[in-house]
Design a protein with these regions (language model features):
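Boundary/linker segments flanking structured domains
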Residues: 1-43, 48-167
Length: 167
């Protein structure tokens, strides 16, 4: 899979420092991005209509300081679609499931690498094409924190069943 690095974070004294940040070059650009940790484990995959906008939002949550004075009571445990998905808790201090995911990633990873997939299907203007690419990458590489959204859930279950269970 052809890819280019757009973001790299390295933990120093418990906080992420930005090593590489090229996301501004992708304002208004649609695509599919992938996120790895220091163990080369795929953490997340997402398609987006604006790479910069989405990764800037995600980056803000990865760089946030999560202090003990926040409300750390557990609200619920995020649902998993597949066994390979990582369990994580959504706490009272979390804005939503997404922010809880990035809080968990920030606590557990020592470094993060984000790549933009630069293949025709991944850069398609057609959202359904990008969603299919996202789903295939996430399932085939067992992305720990990936979560199918809406109608993508059924497509993901069918894809997994046809590719891995019917053999």
């Amino acid at each position: 899979m052809k890819r280019i690095k757009v973001l790299e974070l390295q933990k120093n004294r418990g906080k992420f420092e930005i090593i590489t940040n090229k996301i501004a070059e992708y304002k208004g650009v649609c695509g599919v991005w992938i996120m790895y940790d220091n163990h080369e484990q795929l953490l997340e995959v997402a398609q987006t209509a604006d790479v910069f906008k989405e990764l800037a939002y995600d980056l803000s949550w990865l760089l946030k300081e999560y202090s003990c004075d926040g409300d750390l009571r557990k609200r619920y445990t995020a649902r998993r679609l597949f066994e390979f998905n990582q369990k994580f808790d959504v706490l009272s201090c979390d804005k939503n499931r997404t922010t809880a995911k990035y809080r968990t990633i920030a606590q557990n990873a020592e470094s993060i690498l984000v790549y933009l997939i630069v293949e025709d299907r991944a850069t398609s203007r057609d959202k359904t094409v990008r969603e299919k690419v996202e789903m295939e990458i996430a399932i085939d590489n067992k992305a720990l924190y990936w979560n199918a959204f809406g109608t993508q859930r059924k497509l993901a279950k069918d894809y997994y069943k046809n590719k891995y269970e019917l053999k």
